[in-house]
Amino acid sequence: MALIFRTAMQSVGLLLSLLGWILSIITTYLPHWKNLNLDLNEMENWTMGLWQTCVIQEEVGMQCKDFDSFLALPAELRVSRILMFLSNGLGFLGLLVSGFGLDCLRIGESQRDLKRRLLILGGILSWASGITALVPVSWVAHKTVQEFWDENVPDFVPRWEFGEALFLGWFAGLSLLLGGCLLNCAACSSHAPLALGHYAVAQMQTQCPYLEDGTADPQV
């Protein structure tokens, strides 16, 4: 029963990490980190991502333009690019390492401790990937709120608001964190049954000489 529960925990943790990694990649390239709705022209909406700005018009559709210079971007967008790339890389490494630590993958009975360490390392990498995804998303959201409520900006000036990519990034980061927690919990729970099994084998070995001689065990 414990083995089935541990295997299920490993599978769910790996799937959550995979889901968070995929959503993190989508968040990185989705041009909807910020949305701007013009009151004067409701048929035209602006969106901004880490790589480009887009205008959506009912007659023309979506037209996007890449940013000309990386150094000309605001600080939060420059750092967000780096952190999102780092999150994607850490997430991929976490999935790769965790996959080799699963119980369903047989790499030898003598390497149980190695698999446990791989599972723990994969969980830590998923944690790091989730944190590095949450930081840029939360930073951009914080700057958006600050600019929205800035009293120095006149009321008639349009304000940027939260885009869909921010919510997707939050969900991706939480999925990676939860997946890493499950992987580490599964790795920690896999150590106790193993030690208990070694104790049972050792106890049987101490009783075997008495059974072969036909004498009673003095511990009974």
From Swiss-Prot:
Membrane-spanning parts: 11-31, 82-102, 118-138, 162-182
GO aspect biological process, one term: bicellular tight junction assembly
InterPro entries, per the entry: Claudin, Claudin_CS, PMP22/EMP/MP20/Claudin
Gene responsible for this protein: CLDN24
Cell compartments where the protein resides: Cell junction, Tight junction; Cell membrane
Superkingdom classification of source: Eukaryota
Topology in membrane: Multi-pass membrane protein
UniProt cross-references to PROSITE patterns, sorted A to Z: CLAUDIN
Main localization, broad class: other
UniProt protein name: Claudin-24
Record's function text: Plays a major role in tight junction-specific obliteration of the intercellular space, through calcium-independent cell-adhesion activity.
